[in-house]
Amino acid sequence: MTSLYLRENLTFDQARVQVLHEGKDGKDLYMKGICIQGGIKNANQRVYPVQEIAKATKTLNDQISSGYSVLGEVDHPDDLKINLDRVSHMITEMWMDGPNGYGKMKILPTPMGQLVKTMLESGVKLGVSSRGSGNMNEYGSGEVSDFEIITVDVVAQPSAPGAYPCLLYTSPSPRDLSTSRMPSSA
């Protein structure tokens, strides 16, 4: 098996994207929907077994729950590092529902976040795409193993057929208004 940099994309309709608002005037903008699909061959000719997605989704959600900021970008860079000048959103939670990994992403008031917000509010259907690493079967099946999600990026043309999250405008809960925790360094 060969270890690879893996990017997967889902369209707006495929991801069943929702738009949420909360924050300024009680409204911040969120995208919510499918981030990665399991058990099906995607446009990149890869198949992510459901157990691989479940494990990767849990690991990423554990990082978020521990207080780490998981940031995403507009489009995919050619490597796994996060480029702060391209950040558009922060993933606030990830979970599994059936064979799919879902996520909720807060659109940030960065230049790239403003670009995403303007497009979404103008009716552009943006998709999302997971970015991570893993091994791919060398015998042509396209099956991925040892998958680790680094982040989920906003893209124009996702490879996963259901990765078009919806937009949400929601009000902050009292929990959201409390002091945030920073992870301690070891």
Predicted feature residues:
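Polar/acidic, low-complexity leader/linker segments enriched in S/T/G and N/D
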Residues: 1-62
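Residue microenvironments linked to proteolytic maturation
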Residues: 6, 13, 33, 69-73, ...
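Positively charged, low-complexity intrinsically disordered regions
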Residues: 8, 87-90, 176, 182
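Small/polar-rich, solvent-exposed N-terminal microdomains that initiate assembly or binding
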Residues: 50-82
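Generic alpha-helical secondary structure signal
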Residues: 51-58, 110-114, 185
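Single conserved hydrophobic/aromatic residue that forms the stacking wall/gate
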Residues: 169-186
